[in-house]
Amino acid sequence: MRVDVYDNNVDQAIRVLKKKMNREGMFREMKKRKFFEKPSERRRRKKAEAIRRLRKKLRRASLAGLG
């Protein structure tokens, strides 16, 4: 990942870096890897995420049908 610094504006470069890392999911990944996750917990989390994605997709589809 690369961030250019213009006019010695380090604060802006740090903000850009944080935004890029957030967009890439780096913070979420670091938080996940901080502690070991048992395979059973990983399966449970993945299943919950899939359900969340499905519900979100269904909500968006129902809202698109209303408009």
UniProtKB/Swiss-Prot annotation:
Keyword Ribonucleoprotein in record: yes
Organism superkingdom: Bacteria
Listed GO MF terms: structural constituent of ribosome
Keywords: Ribonucleoprotein, Ribosomal protein
Pfam families xref list: Ribosomal_S21 (PF01165)
Keyword Coiled coil: no
Disulfide bridge positions per record: none
One term under GO cellular component: ribonucleoprotein complex
InterPro entries in the record: Ribosomal_bS21, Ribosomal_bS21_sf
Membrane-spanning parts: none
Biological processes per GO annotation: translation
NCBIfam families listed in its UniProt record: S21p
PANTHER family, A to Z: MITOCHONDRIAL 28S RIBOSOMAL PROTEIN S21, SMALL RIBOSOMAL SUBUNIT PROTEIN BS21M
UniProt similarity note: Belongs to the bacterial ribosomal protein bS21 family.
Name of the protein described by the UniProt record: Small ribosomal subunit protein bS21
Source organism per UniProt: Magnetococcus marinus (strain ATCC BAA-1437 / JCM 17883 / MC-1)
